[in-house]
Amino acid sequence: MAAIHQKFGRSIPLSAMFEYGSIRRLADLLRADADAPAATPLVSIQPKGKKPPCFFVHPAGGNVLCYYDLARCLGTEIPFWGLQAALGEGGVAPGSIAKMAEIYLEAMLDIVHDGVPILGGWSMGALAAFEMARLFHQRTGVAPIVAVLDQIAPDLTSDSTSGSEDLTAKLFAFANKVSELVGHDIGLSKELLAASSMEETNSLFLDKFKAFELAPEATRVEEFQGFLKLMLDHNRITGEYEGGLYPGRVLVFRAEGKMSGSTSGPG
């Protein structure tokens, strides 16, 4: 998408990458006079099938590409949708998990008019999916199954950051998470981050993301700074979420391996 914007000056939503799933079809879209499909939280990753659809909420950072392989493994009998955060101009993160869940539930109900969906998510997305299920139950009296991928109970989560922590501490915590993800120290020390302006910090992180192939080479600093702000906002609301009672089934899926520093298990 960054390369398309750089080359053609056109911004298209992630949903178009799945809907127009070939170079030829994307070219037709770019040639058309009509604008690209309107931005929406809903991303149709695998639209086929007549079984109850799955709706998986993005983790912190807002992207649902992490669910592509999962949707593929589930086959073509189960429609699979992602709920992706808005990352464009004016795309501000909701102020709480509860508000996020409300927005995403409304988007889901635009296309789900009967039946009971399956809700799920990875990391922060699991909390938003759980809250969506609570709201769905409050409205309909029906409790959907919730699939929780590698996310523990809110009061035990290692992702939380207190309001008293300064920006440097939050950025350093994020740098440590990236180091765990790639299996190497990415070299962003607390001292370096403290001495850097926010503009410099965006460039530092983007350079590391490109070096470890976490971001395309064509990604611009302007695009990345929106992602970094969204990541910090998501980490904040994750730490503030307290959850609540839910009468439905919650299925917890955990990876066999564990990153260093992660909490031992779900609460």
Region roles according to the model:
Residues 1-21:
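Phosphopantetheinylated carrier protein domains
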Residues 24-267:
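A hydrolase-biased, glycine/serine/histidine/acidic-enriched motif that marks catalytic-domain neighborhoods
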